[in-house]
Amino acid sequence: SPTKFVKKHHLANQTLSELLNAFLEEKGLARADVIRAAALNETFGYQIFMGQRNPSRNKVLQIAFAMRLNLRETNRILRAAGASDLYCKNRRDAIIIFCLDKGYRLQKTNEELYRFDEETIC
């Protein structure tokens, strides 16, 4: 049935907090470690994971890098946060996509953005 298909493939409209917590579980990550790796204020980070705060696009990207998400997963959490997907024809986004694909960490990604005179993520 369509309902089973949607559930099996996680296509239901999940909130950002639901998605983030599902990724934590799926990837065996600890929330505190992700918040630290994302260079987020601890309280603010916990509020994002609890669904009490709506983060900016850059904050969501910080979390994506901290969780080592791929492009598809990153775009899912961006959409859930009400932000635009990473778009390859946008120069800054293209650099971020490249860094995600290469498995770069947040700091290395910021260095690449800086090197190309683009706004860093944080």
Model-inferred region functions:
Residues N75-G103:
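Short, charged recognition helix plus adjacent turn
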Residues A32, T43, R72:
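Key DNA-contact positions within bacterial/archaeal DNA-binding proteins
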Residues A30-A37:
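Short alpha-helical "recognition helix" segments of helix-turn-helix
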Residues A39-P55, A80-G82:
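Recognition helix of helix-turn-helix/homeodomain-like DNA-binding domains
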Residues F65-M67, R92-T120:
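Long, compositionally biased
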Residues Q52-F65:
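Short, basic-rich loop-to-helix N-cap that marks the start of a DNA-contacting helix
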Residues S1-A30, T109-C122:
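A short, Lys/Arg-rich alpha-helix, primarily the initiator
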Residues L24, I35, A64:
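The alpha-helix within a helix-turn-helix
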